[in-house]
């Protein structure tokens, strides 16, 4: 895994040896897919746009690489059963969402920027400046972002009492 992260963050290249996060929302919410079918979300870490990866050329090839790996490991038969798919690249994050270099998750996931070391939800310099989102405590991803909002909500409630 360390070699994979080194390729992404230090060498800024795509790797054939990928890791991914796989989520199946239809397992807990049947409305996420037509009856008898499933919905999956796959998150694959890739380098940001400082890498100069040409996503117009590489996007479909990389998607096929991801499907091949899932087909050989956790979801045999996935390739021939996909009804509809799409993917987002760092280009989308940079152009449509105006994130720096197409970064989808804020700061680099390393120990010195994790857990307590992430940006705190209240500025240590300006007393009325607050932060919420993927780059703040407690962390990235949708659960982290929602938890960050909850932390801030609790902080405001605590300040109102005291």
Where are these regions (language model features)?
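Conserved FAD/dinucleotide-binding core of flavoprotein oxidoreductases
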Residues: 34-68
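Active-site-proximal substrate-binding core of FAD-dependent oxidoreductases
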Residues: 88-90, 157-162
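Hydrophobic, well-ordered secondary-structure elements that form the walls
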Residues: 42, 70, 129, 133, ...
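A conserved FAD-binding loop/helix module that cradles the flavin
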Residues: 114, 134-157
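A glycine-rich dinucleotide-binding beta-alpha-beta segment and adjacent secondary-structure elements
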Residues: 15-21, 76-138
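Short helix/loop capping segments that flank catalytic or ligand/cofactor-binding pockets
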Residues: 30-32, 52, 139-141
